[in-house]
């Protein structure tokens, strides 16, 4: 009996040793992610900055965060050993989404900068076309009906048909990134008015990961959107210390009701990786080791 107990104990210890490193990934483990689509949620506080690795190993950014957020963005890109970016998508021109564009382009070679071709309001704040031109990147103005093949992933673009001069957030470009049966829905600062138009005109908005519009505040993320998207994970680009509205109790309760696991811009991690293998998605913490 004692011998059997010892064998059971050894087996348990072996399993613990094998799984001890699970849940975190560092610089030395990034090669294992090739062949997957990976969304890296960079921990910059109130602001949007994401790195997207497509299955063939190419890299895109979805928004850049503020200028002062650049050190954290650079840290993540260094962990990932990124030297070149195939493209940068800017959902709109607010500084907490696009303010870091020039600093990124100073260090990294960027092939293309993707903009909404219908937004003649928010981009004026940062003039991304001039920045792209200065660094030799091609500017691609999207109209909202494109389906882009990007290195084994697909980016389906949606842009609101009517520009909103009263609420600039509702001019945000939305892109659904998909790889086989997995997908990420990136929404910029889309609020409820734009959500309604999106749901009326976008055929299949289901996604495993939903980036909540407008930093998780109560003016976005309607019940109708959650019912249509049916996400497993919800990303909120804000935290209680910097922006209490981002940890809105009503939205938190709504996410819980719909079975959505929420991730905020808080903690010591450099980023959270949402790793899509084409069948399912898992969330893994990225630490600066």
Predicted feature locations:
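Non-globular, low-confidence helical/coil segments that flank catalytic cores
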Residues: 2-7, 17-289
């Amino acid at each position: 009996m004692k011998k059997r107990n010892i064998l059971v104990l050894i087996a348990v210890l072996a399993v613990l040793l094998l799984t001890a490193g699970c849940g975190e990934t560092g610089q030395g483990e990034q090669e294992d992610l090739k062949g997957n689509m990976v969304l890296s949620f960079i921990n910059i506080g109130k602001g949007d900055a994401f790195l997207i690795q497509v299955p063939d190993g190419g890299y895109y950014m979805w928004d850049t965060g503020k200028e002062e957020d650049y050190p954290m963005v650079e840290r993540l890109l260094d962990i990932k050993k990124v030297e070149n970016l195939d493209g940068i998508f800017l959902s709109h021109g607010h500084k907490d989404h696009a303010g870091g564009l020039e600093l990124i382009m100073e260090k990294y070679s960027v092939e293309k900068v993707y903009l909404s071709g219908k937004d003649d309001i928010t981009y004026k704040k940062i003039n991304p076309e001039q920045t792209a031109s200065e660094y030799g990147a091609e500017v691609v103005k999207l109209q909202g009906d494109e389906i882009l093949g990007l290195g084994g992933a697909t980016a389906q673009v949606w842009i609101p048909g009517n520009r909103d001069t009263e609420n600039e957030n509702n001019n945000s470009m939305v892109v659904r990134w998909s790889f086989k049966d997995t997908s990420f829905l990136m929404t910029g600062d889309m609020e409820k008015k734009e959500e309604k138009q999106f749901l009326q005109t976008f055929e299949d908005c289901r996604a495993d990961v939903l980036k909540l519009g407008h930093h998780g505040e109560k003016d976005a993320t309607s019940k109708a959107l959650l019912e249509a998207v049916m996400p497993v994970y919800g990303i909120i680009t804000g935290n209680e210390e910097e922006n209490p509205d981002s940890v809105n109790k009503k939205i938190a309760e709504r996410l819980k009701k719909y079975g959505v696991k929420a991730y905020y811009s808080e903690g010591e991690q450099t980023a959270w990786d949402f790793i899509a293998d084409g069948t399912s998605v898992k969330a893994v913490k990225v630490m600066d080791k």
